[in-house]
Amino acid sequence: MTAIALAVAAIPEGLPAIATAILAIGAYRMAKKNALVRKLSAVETLGSVNVICTDKTGTITKGEMTLKQISFIDSSYMIEEDKTKISVVPSDGNPNEGNLEFLLSIIPPHVGDDAQIVNDNGRTILKGSPTEGAVLYAVYKLKGPGWIDERKRQYPVVKVYPFDRFRKMKSSVHIIDGKYLVITSGAPDVILSRSTRVLTRDGEVVIDKDTWNKLRLLIDELGSKGYRTFGVAYRWMSNFSDEYSDEEVENELVFMAVLGIIDPPREGVAEAIKIARKAGIKVVMVTGDHKSTATAIAKMIGLDVDNGLVIEGRELDKMSEDELQKIIDKVVVFARATPEHKLRIVKAFKARGYRVAMTGDGVNDAPALKMADIGVAMGIKGTEVAKEASQIVLLDDNFSTIVEAIKEGRVIYENLKKPINFLLSCNLGEVATIFGAELLKMPIPLKPLHLLWVNVVTDVAPATVLGLEAPEPDIMDRPPRPVSDRLITKRKLIYYIAMGSIIGAALLLLYNVLLKEGLEIARTTVFTSLVIAEIGLVLTMRSETKHFWELPRNRWLLPGLAIAILLQLIVIYTPLREVFDTVFLDARHWALSLIVPIAIILVDALRKSLKIKL
């Protein structure tokens, strides 16, 4: 009987179900906060994340692009919009209506089907490319749908060379009066590198060194305002063949204008970054945007650009893995980055010992999402491939949700430790009681059925309640959990062995005193005292450092403890007592049963007052 009792006492039978329930409840709470957990293990991993690599567009920013500025080399226009109309207002230089009109005319045929303006029950909706959509929408508001349709007829499309992330540009070829007009748009610096002339108010001018510098300054100036920059160029060709490659078409361009498109930061992102920084989490922005644009947005949201590095993709391409790892700690922004760069960035951070969360939405982001400790896909604009490669999907595509998910991950990890520690102490107390009684040659104080009842039934409600604790106020003031952190450390194990020994000693003392009143009375009182001891353990396990009266209220605590007591009353005061070999207890026996929980609370209060860490 003793051997069976020891075997039952040593195994916390309810632990797997409780741990799974806590993780599932945590995943449910995260889903309510727009973070959908695809893999349950990610819930626990989140608490140790110490670097977030995040996209800019749609995650840091709203993803709502609006054309704000059109800049030629010698003139600039601001786009002003109110509730009823949109207007183009000259801001500096010498306005040239002819150049502006030409630019507006070629935008609709060039955009083509890559962006569309549709009417949905009275609402104007943009579909397709958000960047081209922002430009097309401005033209739509300025000129109207009829004008746009007329321009498309005026510039019929012969061929389109679609945008790709390697060329960073798109070109369309149109036939007009027997000649071919090539319209190219994309990254201004790349388009400038393919241009030999620039459009001015006096016509086309060859780009010399001074002109080149002036155009570079113009691009950087718009980027420094936080605008996403969009370059437009063109060229005329007397002959064209459908077999021409993009390289044959996209050269000797006439640089036309730089367009500034604003995509403002989301509300709450700056505050979320402050919280992340306070929590010891490094935030790195990874974007395909121009360096000046990325830097400006980074400053707006509070990233420490002045004391960190902003690295462009072309600089990254020149670095070896060792060189990247040496500077990765200092990087705040990666600009002009590609999905391949994302993968290298994740590898570099992991090589430095970081736990990395990486966001992504495209098919090509999948390798980086898989490589990251936590892959975070976008729920709104993300592809199915990205979602499948991720552990978490953001239902609102919002950066702030990542920080909230990390907070929830920390809470869940802390709450996962509490029932484990609780059950460990309970079971060690049971083992100490059975083993001590055997050493002292006393009759076995707890039968295997009693121990099973405690482990499988009455322990479950209090342990689950511990897993539902509210976050401690300073949860995001602590550094991330080290990767080497363990649920049970040597110090904790020693403490819980000591706590189990105290429980065992107190129960044996009580048992010895009551044996003279009869074996059934002594066993029933010890059995009940063990269940009530859970009250003391639950109260002490709510926090490793704070007294239970200093913690936020847990609305599930009293119901959980009440369920455990009610279940114990059932096996004492109903016919089930014959199954469990229990007898009625009077008020004195119930009072004696309180000795163990009081001892537990006093010992733990002393430890916390002396600030002895586990």
Stretches found by the model and what they are:
Residues 480-496:
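The cytoplasmic-loop to transmembrane-helix boundary for the fourth helix
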Residues 494-508:
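Alpha-helical transmembrane segments of multi-pass integral membrane proteins
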Residues 458, 502-504, 524-538:
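Generic alpha-helical transmembrane segments
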Residues 1-479, 487-488, 501, 512, ...:
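Conserved cytosolic headpiece of P-type ATPases
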Residues 541:
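A C-terminal functional module that forms or caps the active site or interfaces directly
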Residues 519-523:
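Transmembrane alpha-helix entry/boundary detector in multi-pass membrane proteins
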